[in-house]
Amino acid sequence: MTHEFKTPIATINLALDAIRNPKIIEDKEKVYRYLQMIRDENKRMHAQVENVLRISKLEKKELDITKEPTVIHDIIEDAIEHVNLILEDKQGTIVKHYNAARTTCLVNEVHFTNVLVNILENAIKYSPDVPEIEVFTENIKDMILIKIKDHGLGMSKVAQKRVFEKFYREHTGDLHNVKGHGLGLAYVKRIVEDHNGQVYVESEKGKGSTFIIKIPLIN
């Protein structure tokens, strides 16, 4: 858990030290770059704190998860809107394949949007070049299936089994490339299960990952 906070704090400290350097302070472009770094790491820490609180409340059954009939395609569109700026910054694309004819489920709009945003952010984050993401929906019996597919780094079989654990990190052999999903995917799993659904991942190293969510439709 400490790693989730130590890394951004260390980055912020390094950036502050760099800005204090007399040679750097006169270079507006570099100062702006370091300030952006501080801003990004601060946001990252804030997100981790939010996730800690969410998981804690979930475990104590204190999180308000009131559910209402909702059109899943609307939730997906909302989640995509949330990540659009990050995606545009990386010149990435999201291609939608909405094949589900029945799409109304009993969900908590806020938490289910967070679930999809989390998976989309990971898809963008772990795409080494320009992110190319695909979102699919389909109906299987009385369920809706949502698939979010990326063409990024992919993950090992071990990582696929453990990726929904709190603070699981996959060591790739490169000290500078330790992939951490933090609390995000643990939160995803708890929320999906609270919606009587399932979430799992299919992945291959170097070929990308597909996160699959199944939740029941309203009959």
How does the language model describe each region?
Residues D40-M45:
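Short alpha-helical segment of the dimerization/phosphotransfer core of two-component systems
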Residues K60-I65, T104-V107:
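Conserved micro-motifs of the catalytic ATP-binding
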Residues T66-N84:
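A conserved beta-strand-to-alpha-helix junction within the catalytic ATP-binding
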Residues I86-K96:
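Short conserved segments within the C-terminal catalytic ATPase subdomain
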Residues A123-I124:
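Short helix-loop "hinge" at the ATP-lid/N-box region of the Bergerat-fold HATPase_c
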Residues M155-F167:
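Short conserved segment of the HATPase_c
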Residues N196-Q198:
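Conserved glycine-rich
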